[in-house]
Amino acid sequence: MDESIRTWTIEDVENARFEDDHVQPYVHLRRISADPAVREVTFPPNATLGVHSHPCDTLYVIRSGEFIVEGERSYRPGDLRWVRAGVSYGPERAGADGAVVLVVSTNGPFGVRWGHA
């Protein structure tokens, strides 16, 4: 396995400021529900996340701001985005005013695997 690929999982954290080499400068996570796994992710202005995938199918609901996924498009409040488990994408970034996104893991725990699958 490529050593640049790492897996990160958060299950029991109510609120967490998440910092990592793949996240600049950080994002804030707030657990809404454990089952199904629903997190509110707050991106500061222009925050970026590197290429990654999730271990489960994931639905994004854009609540505020602008959420940009390289190779896809810019998402705005009310937009939905669906990603199948194991599909790598990104980088992704918030717009100039930041973004708030609900991330719903539809068939498993919330997690991130950095790099290409």
Segments predicted by a language model, with ranges:
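A short, N-terminal "cap"/entry segment at the start of jelly-roll beta-barrel domains
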Residues: 1-35, 116-117
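Double-stranded beta-helix
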Residues: 3-6, 90, 94-117
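A short beta-loop-beta micro-motif enriched in histidine and acidic residues
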Residues: 31-37, 43-58, 75
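Short acidic (Asp/Glu) patches
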Residues: 44-46, 63-64, 84-87
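Glycine- and acidic-residue-biased ligand/ion/polar-headgroup-sensing regions
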Residues: 55-70
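Short acidic-glycine-tyrosine-enriched beta hairpin
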Residues: 71-88
